[in-house]
Regions:
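Surface beta-strand/loop "capping" patches
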Residues: 127-162
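Beta-strand-rich binding/interaction modules
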Residues: 34-36, 148-185
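Residue-level structural signal for beta-strand termini and adjacent loop
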Residues: 46-47, 138, 163, 185
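Accessory beta-strand-rich segments of carbohydrate-active enzymes
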Residues: 1-133, 160-161
Length: 185
């Protein structure tokens, strides 16, 4: 059956006007619909089960919805995949609906877990940034020999404003003190 998570918070006095506020969820499991101060922030106003999958990250720009003073409310509706209603599977433990969490369905020594681990299964938090944010950075290493490594850095850049921005992406890879910098227009 569906169930709700709900919490309230106030912005700290150190919050600076003109900054973006992002609401992050590291993991939600199965189906999730997100609300902020009574407004639906995932999918469309009439859609349901907007975030669908196992252990999915979600990020929402709540800058225009946040109250600078007073209480802000976050609510998340979680819906588990009810196997009996969603498909005619012969798997009574729900593994067909939870392939990434076989342990949640029970195997060998572990009993079945009601709800198949549905819910908010990671951290939820706010991040305050400028208009341009870096998302999902990673470093790939190719090792042609044991004495040499070729590194490539990749990331997505999101401009949340309506005007073009110029930014510099820079960083240092440790160990080795390997620095990099790139102008982005």
């Amino acid at each position: 059956r569906p169930f709700w998570y709900r919490t309230e918070f106030e912005l700290p006095s150190s919050y600076s006007e003109g900054k973006r506020v992002w609401l992050h969820f590291d993991n939600t499991n199965r189906f999730a619909d997100f609300y902020f101060n009574g407004e639906k922030i995932s999918g469309t106003k009439t859609s349901t089960k907007d975030v669908s999958g196992h252990m999915l990250r979600s990020k929402f720009d709540v800058t225009n919805l946040i109250k600078k003073s007073g209480k802000n409310v976050i609510a998340v509706l979680i819906t588990d995949a009810d196997q009996k209603k969603t498909r005619k599977a012969k798997d009574p433990y729900g593994v067909a609906c939870s392939p990434s969490y076989l342990a949640g369905a029970g195997w060998d020594w572990m009993p079945y877990v009601p709800g198949r681990l549905a819910g908010i299964t990671g951290n939820a938090y706010l991040v305050v940034t400028g208009d341009v944010v870096m998302e999902d950075p990673w470093v790939r290493s190719e090792l042609p020999t044991l004495q040499k490594a070729e590194l490539s850095v990749s990331t997505d850049i999101r401009n949340a404003s309506s005007s073009p921005k110029e930014v510099v992406v820079s960083g240092v890879i440790q160990p080795g003190n390997i620095s990099f910098s790139k102008d982005i227009r």
